[in-house]
Regions:
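Short amphipathic alpha-helix that is part of the acyltransferase structural core
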Residues: 2-53
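Active-site/acyl-donor-binding loops of N-acyltransferases
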Residues: 2-4, 130-155
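Long, low-complexity, intrinsically disordered polar/charged segments
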Residues: 40-53, 89-100, 152-155
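Active-site rim helix/loop that mediates acceptor-substrate recognition in acyltransferases
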Residues: 46-69
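Short, flexible, glycine/charge-rich loop motifs used to bind or transfer phosphoryl groups or to couple energy/partner
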Residues: 59-60, 85-87, 118
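Conserved donor-binding loop and adjoining core beta-sheet/short helix segment
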Residues: 64-106
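Acyl-donor binding region in acyl/amide transferases
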Residues: 90-141
């Protein structure tokens, strides 16, 4: 896949989509154009998660380049949203797939994974991590593996 790197952290774009379904990184300067569509979509992902983050916090972190926004498309129609985060740990940089939602998310994430992996590697990441519900382990398949379980209870 031919990549064009834009000045923004996650703005890798495929030169020509190989299928009707494709993924692209959204440059921060274009965030305001996409947010009316992707913001409500992310709300659904937040509701299915632990509620530890609000939509406006994601928006602010995207504007501050702490998170990266990716959209899955069919043609020009936005089908889904993925948020990534780069973390620096003692063992190196890790690219975390954090919030994913939309129609047929598994299909477009798998389609766009090579692009996201190329971006993460170019940014110096040596590991990719997905944080989500247990069903993602089956969707991602090999070479992904479940490393630990996070348990939680209300007080």
């Amino acid at each position: 896949m031919t990549l064009q790197q834009f000045p923004d952290a996650c703005a890798f774009q495929p030169a020509m989509p190989k299928s009707k379904r494709w993924v692209s990184g959204i440059p921060t300067m274009e965030l305001h154009l996409f947010w009316p569509t992707v913001g409500p979509m992310l709300e659904r992902a937040i509701e299915h998660g632990d509620g530890g983050i609000k939509r406006w916090q994601i928006y602010d972190a995207l504007k501050e380049l702490k998170l990266q926004l990716w959209v899955g498309r069919v043609g020009m129609e936005i089908e889904g949203v993925l948020v990534t985060e780069m973390q620096i740990r003692p063992t190196g940089k890790v690219c975390i797939l954090r919030h994913a939602c939309g129609e047929d998310a598994a299909a477009w994430i798998k389609e766009g994974l090579p692009l996201i992996q190329a971006w993460a590697k170019a940014e110096g990441a040596t590991v990719m991590e997905l944080q989500g519900r247990r069903g993602w382990a089956k969707i991602m398949g090999k070479p992904w593996r479940e490393r630990w379980v996070v348990m939680q209870r209300s007080l």
